[in-house]
């Protein structure tokens, strides 16, 4: 189980958000993962991406992309 979000997870998130054309300044990634992970649009227009602590990042990134597309 993931305890802290590291560069591997952040790079996987940015790979997806870059592909979707979302500016990195509009992404908030808490360094504490949770289970389940969460993708939501905040009232200020930014996207909060909370990494899922119990799912490998490669698998979770695909689910995250699906959720982000719903919010665009």
Language model regions located:
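A metal-dependent hydrolase signature that marks the N-terminal structural subdomain at the beginning
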Residues: 1-25
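Short, structured interface segments that constitute the first stable element of a domain
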Residues: 1-2, 43-46, 63
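Catalytic zinc-binding patch centered on the HExxH motif and its immediate surroundings
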Residues: 29-46, 58
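Short, charge-rich amphipathic interface segments used for partner binding and complex assembly
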Residues: 40-53, 69
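Short pre-active-site segment immediately N-terminal to the catalytic Zn-binding motif
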Residues: 49-63
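Active-site recognition of the HExxH zinc-binding catalytic motif
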Residues: 62-72
